[in-house]
Design a protein with these regions (language model features):
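Short basic, glycine-rich beta-strand/loop surfaces that mediate nucleic-acid
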Residues: 81-129
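Solvent-exposed alpha-helices and their adjacent loops that cap or buttress functional pockets
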Residues: 30-31, 58-59, 96-98
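Extended, non-globular alpha-helical segments
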Residues: 39-60
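Gly/Ser/Thr-rich loops at beta-strand to alpha-helix junctions
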Residues: 72-75, 98
């Protein structure tokens, strides 16, 4: 091993593995903006209805994961978990994120760069005013 490799090994042992764009990952439930198909706010996830944009994404796209904000009660998350299970899409409940307004994300396993990831309605506008 070279000195640089030993240095890197020691730093990773002390500080953990390096993470790209940690601020962005804190906002987007552990994933990157460039991978997101659809994002809902916490308020949108708490609504009784299931957003059709999320269902459409789950039904038509493969190689994706549903990320859910763990601060939201399970009753509000369960409808999205059932939809993901129906389409055999894996889901993750993220409970170690920092303060974020994001409640749900449907993300790819690679960069897709969707221009507008948010479902813009009254609840979204109230959240980000």
């Amino acid at each position: 091993m070279s000195d640089d490799q030993i240095d890197l090994y020691i730093k990773q042992g002390i500080y953990g593995t390096f993470e790209t764009k940690p601020e962005e990952r804190n906002v987007y439930l552990g994933t990157l903006r460039e991978r997101i198909y659809v994002a809902l706010t916490i308020g949108q996830v708490r609504q009784n209805k299931i957003y059709s944009e999320v269902l459409a994404s789950l039904e038509t796209r493969k190689n994706q994961t549903l990320f859910l904000n763990g601060t939201i009660d399970y009753g509000a998350l369960s409808k999205y978990i059932k939809a993901a299970n129906k389409e055999k899409i894996p889901f993750t409940i993220v409970s170690d994120q920092n303060d974020t307004k994001i409640g749900l994300i449907v993300a790819s396993d690679h960069a897709i760069d969707h221009k507008d990831i948010y479902v813009r309605d009254k609840i979204f506008e109230q959240t980000f005013k």
